[in-house]
Amino acid sequence: MSSWILLAHAETSGFGLNLDLFETNLINLAIIIGLLVYAGRGFLGNLLSNRRAAIEAEIREVEEKLASSAQALSQAQTQLKEAEAEAARLLVEAKARAAAVRQEILDKAAADVERLKATAAQDVSTEQQRVLDELRRYAVAQALSRVETQLSQQLDEAAQQRLIDRSLATL
């Protein structure tokens, strides 16, 4: 019984406006949607197809980036393992070198101590010999001094002359 905007009512005797908004809006909306679907099918299809292609391209690009990132991560992990192995090797070498240097220093210090002991012993021996020689000279000088004193007191002039002559003869 109803039609589009201008509708004729069977009960009334003429044409008039249908003021029932609900009925007229639904009909108008159905007509507009039908026209849009009919006219915009190609356009909307192309638009959706292009959008789908763009999304698929972005997905492929993201997947490629993911694959390259995974490969880069794998390479970085490999390099990290190699670096850790190298660091461990260097640490072992450094410890071994430190132990060798330590032993070398200890050996050198022991040799220096022995050399110093030998030098000190030689110095002590030399000093001891010098002191003994000096004591001997002092003892001889003291003995000679006493002998001279005693001889001069006990010997007369003639006995002294004979002693001097005998001493000169033995030389």
Swiss-Prot record:
Compartmental location: Cellular thylakoid membrane
Keywords assigned: ATP synthesis, CF(0), Hydrogen ion transport, Ion transport, Membrane, Thylakoid, Transmembrane, Transmembrane helix, Transport
Molecular functions per Gene Ontology: proton-transporting ATP synthase activity, rotational mechanism
GO CC, alphabetical: plasma membrane-derived thylakoid membrane; proton-transporting ATP synthase complex
Membrane topology: Single-pass membrane protein
Transmembrane segments: 26-48
InterPro entries listed in its UniProt record: ATP_synth_B-like_membr_sf, ATP_synth_b/b'su_bac/chlpt
Main location: membrane
Origin: domain of life: Bacteria
SUPFAM superfamilies: F1F0 ATP synthase subunit B, membrane domain
Gene3D superfamilies: F1F0 ATP synthase subunit B, membrane domain
Subunit-structure text: F-type ATPases have 2 components, F(1) - the catalytic core - and F(0) - the membrane proton channel. F(1) has five subunits: alpha(3), beta(3), gamma(1), delta(1), epsilon(1). F(0) has four main subunits: a(1), b(1), b'(1) and c(10-14). The alpha and beta chains form an alternating ring which encloses part of the gamma chain. F(1) is attached to F(0) by a central stalk formed by the gamma and epsilon chains, while a peripheral stalk is formed by the delta, b and b' chains.
Function (record text): F(1)F(0) ATP synthase produces ATP from ADP in the presence of a proton or sodium gradient. F-type ATPases consist of two structural domains, F(1) containing the extramembraneous catalytic core and F(0) containing the membrane proton channel, linked together by a central stalk and a peripheral stalk. During catalysis, ATP synthesis in the catalytic domain of F(1) is coupled via a rotary mechanism of the central stalk subunits to proton translocation.
Family: Belongs to the ATPase B chain family.
HAMAP family (UniProt xref): ATP_synth_b_bprime
NCBIfam families per UniProt: PRK07352.1 (NF005606)
Annotated protein name in UniProt: ATP synthase subunit b
